[in-house]
């Protein structure tokens, strides 16, 4: 009598579990609430110069891919270093950054940039998480301020300009 009871128990368990394991809705969408796209125009030149080279994030072989003058180009035949970064490339880099960790990005933006270290982008740039390029910013330096002020919705244009020439 134990066997039929066990079969009934397993069948009931599976019947309850199967709906929970249903495939995701293919029509579902996620709204990305990234930092202001227009102000990214001030941040992008620093990221392109420091992070977007072919040996770093300017390649298709990285999870975070950046497009622009120093690395990957969107237009066929446009080679690195040959022409300025296009607006389409800035858009693609913005989308790549915002979509890397969409839920965390949404939370950081909703919190007006509080605790930006929740983002892998910030942790790796600061060197608090393993990064092949090492630490590229120090907390509070102009490079860090450029990124974190953008995440907070108050892009520090002066810091972003200084980040381009910061040693």
Protein language model regions, located:
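Aromatic- and Gly/Pro-enriched helix-to-coil junctions and flexible linker segments
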Residues: 21-167
């Amino acid at each position: 009598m134990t066997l039929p009871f066990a079969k009934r128990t397993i069948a009931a368990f599976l019947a309850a579990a199967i709906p929970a394991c249903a495939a995701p809705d293919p029509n579902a969408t996620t709204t990305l609430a990234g930092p202001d796209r227009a102000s990214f125009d001030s941040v992008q030149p620093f990221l392109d110069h420091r992070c977007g080279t072919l040996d770093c994030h300017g390649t298709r072989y990285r999870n975070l891919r950046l497009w622009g003058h120093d690395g990957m180009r969107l237009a066929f035949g446009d080679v690195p270093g040959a022409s300025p970064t296009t607006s389409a490339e800035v858009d693609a880099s913005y989308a790549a950054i915002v979509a890397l960790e969409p839920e965390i990005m949404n939370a950081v933006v909703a919190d007006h940039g509080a605790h930006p270290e929740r983002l892998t982008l910030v942790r790796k740039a600061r060197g608090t998480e393993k990064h092949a390029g090492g630490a590229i910013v120090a907390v509070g330096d102009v490079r860090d301020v450029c990124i974190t002020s953008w995440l907070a919705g108050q892009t520090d244009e002066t810091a972003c300009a200084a980040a381009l020439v910061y040693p």
